[in-house]
Amino acid sequence: MKIAIIGSGISGLYAAWRLSEQHQVTVYEKNNYFGGHTDTHELEIEGTKVAVDSGFIVFNDYNYPLFTDMLKKLGVETQSSDMSFSVNNLVSGLQYNPSKKWSLFARPQNFLNRKFLQMLSDLLRFYDDNKDIDVADIDPNLSIEEYLDLHKYSHEFRYEHLYPMCGALWSAPVEQVGQIPYRFVVSFFQHHRMLQLKERPQWQTVKHGSASYIRAIQKKCRSIEWKFAEVKAVSRSPETVLIETVEGQSQYDWVIFA
């Protein structure tokens, strides 16, 4: 069958990779590059070329089983990545790294810091209260700030840990993090095993930049037709699908919006 895939993010690329084994596939992309969120830049540092990712950066086999399997089958190299989190608050003077037990108390003065110990206490309470909660039972309109107020979480836990972490995860100003839905935060933390102290997933990154897997798909799946073209319209008949671009119309059996 002739199949059109509109969009070349990971969903479109994965579909193209699998379907091209048995079908004639065409991928449409309105941008001037394939890969969607994947954005690898090649920089030269002291005479050495270095691939730097500014879009898609990390993955793990627990949350991304199909993606991990695809990389293995394509022969794309990966390596372990450090997804640690640390805080250096220039206003309060608090510094800590909770990634390891020894790094958490690397600064002896934190042992005697009442606010730091309060933050740790609330952190453990937040983990314990939310790791097994059914997200479906959470009010979708309840913000994380409202939840923290309701359960009397400290200012230190919010501004020295939870808010900075959420801000780093979603590129959001710390001042606005409190408005994020509590349900969304808990769902994300549960899904990525961030509410447990043990058995957290080992994060991985693609060697030579995430764009490596795009090149691998294009090399392996030479039958795929790649088009830099914005789709203007899609129309259906009982038997076919018409894709319209500035170049004209093309006919397919199926279309996938990715």
Question: Predicted segment positions?
Answer:
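Glycine-rich FAD pyrophosphate-binding loop
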Residues: 20-44
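Mobile amphipathic helical/loop "lid" adjacent to a hydrophobic cofactor/ligand pocket
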Residues: 61-182, 186-187
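N-terminal glycine-rich dinucleotide-binding loop that anchors FAD/FMN and/or NAD(P) in oxidoreductases
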Residues: 41-67
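Conserved beta-strand-loop-beta-strand element in the redox core of flavoprotein oxidoreductases
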Residues: 233-250
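N-terminal Rossmann-like FAD-binding beta1-loop-alpha1 element of flavoenzymes
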Residues: 2-27
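Helical element adjacent to the flavin cofactor pocket in flavoenzyme catalytic cores
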Residues: 187-238
